[in-house]
């Protein structure tokens, strides 16, 4: 896996799924391919994106700044600086300085990532802040190692909380989660339908599922009543895909 592919993988792992994620993936690909060279416009676009947490915006801003060539005097952006200040915790800053000294002696991406993984996400973000604010310099490879370690720490905690939700025995949460997934699958079916001949059928199935979810939410139902809803929808989606000759395993 190339270095930039690895960076893109880690960064996208902390962006919530949805149309915005696809848009960010496209921007990262363009930046890494040297197709997008207007850093100021890119940062302005990033600053105004909804949904993203300040830290995710900070990390993306750091990656864009590292990658896009810019004039030396270009102003640092406040929204990135604020996100990478380790929540203003002096302990994070102390650890960030110690980490920076170690990274300064490192020259490889994997070496830097290995060192950084033993620090907390707060200390890692503060260390990125030091580099972003030009208080310290490391090689681009080392900076990318720091980025990937930070994303791995964040993705790990997201995965833990996601797993807790998936394995929860609370029937109300499981019921709501099934309905949310059914709605998301319905939306995916509508997007895939496009202008094909079978589109009407797909739209019909998706529309029925949406109406059912809305009705369930409006009148309130027993938590076990949604058990088959998502499975039925996925079955319909897969049957539709087979007829279309499309295989999109990611909806499983």
Curated annotation (Swiss-Prot):
This is Matrix protein 1. It is found in: Virion membrane; Host nucleus. Residues 1-164 are annotated as: Membrane-binding. Keywords: Host nucleus, Membrane, RNA-binding, Viral matrix protein, Virion. Homodimer and homomultimer. Interacts with NEP. Binds ribonucleocapsid by both interacting with genomic RNA and NP protein. May interact with HA and NA. Cannot bind NP without genomic RNA. Gene3D superfamilies: 1.10.10.180, 1.20.91.10. SMART domains: Flu_M1_C (SM00759). Plays critical roles in virus replication, from virus entry and uncoating to assembly and budding of the virus particle. M1 binding to ribonucleocapsids (RNPs) in nucleus seems to inhibit viral transcription. Interaction of viral NEP with M1-RNP is thought to promote nuclear export of the complex, which is targeted to the virion assembly site at the apical plasma membrane in polarized epithelial cells. Interactions with NA and HA may bring M1, a non-raft-associated protein, into lipid rafts. Forms a continuous shell on the inner side of the lipid bilayer in virion, where it binds the RNP. Determines the virion's shape: spherical or filamentous. Clinical isolates of influenza are characterized by the presence of significant proportion of filamentous virions, whereas after multiple passage on eggs or cell culture, virions have only spherical morphology. Filamentous virions are thought to be important to infect neighboring cells, and spherical virions more suited to spread through aerosol between hosts organisms. It comes from Influenza A virus (strain A/Tokyo/3/1967 H2N2). Transmembrane segments: none annotated. Belongs to the influenza viruses Matrix protein M1 family. Coiled coil: none annotated.
